[in-house]
């Protein structure tokens, strides 16, 4: 039963957040019943060295338990390097095209597959992958069970 609830939560959460991105106005909502962030209210963090920004939406990815994080890969061929996470992660592409590669050979030009808006991706725990954006920003909703860490791996040439 617990596994069914967890699966249901992972499937419904992206729909809720996708709906939040499409809201144009929401006058008169009771904050005891509903809280929300419109797209222009997302407090994106600074752009990191790989070219991504993030904002924690729910939970704390550094601690045990469920979390959801917005991640924005900025355009301009910005990619993470090959790495893995200890736990499965579930990703919905909300905007743009996200490019995903697997394995220790880093080759953004020939080794990636495009994931357009609406795509759902599972990064399985302890499996090497890398990802990013090419010619447009890519906004993602990443969900999982913390703690969420990343372990870099040696790249193959």
Could you tell me what each predicted segment is?
Residues 2-15:
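Bacterial N-terminal signal peptides that target proteins for export
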Residues 33-35, 128-157:
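Double-stranded beta-helix
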Residues 62, 104-126:
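Short acidic-glycine-tyrosine-enriched beta hairpin
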Residues 18-25:
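C-terminal segment of classical bacterial N-terminal signal peptides
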Residues 25-70, 155-157:
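A short, N-terminal "cap"/entry segment at the start of jelly-roll beta-barrel domains
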Residues 74-77, 84-106:
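Glycine- and acidic-residue-biased ligand/ion/polar-headgroup-sensing regions
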Residues 67-85, 124-126:
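Conserved short histidine dyad/triad with adjacent acidic residue
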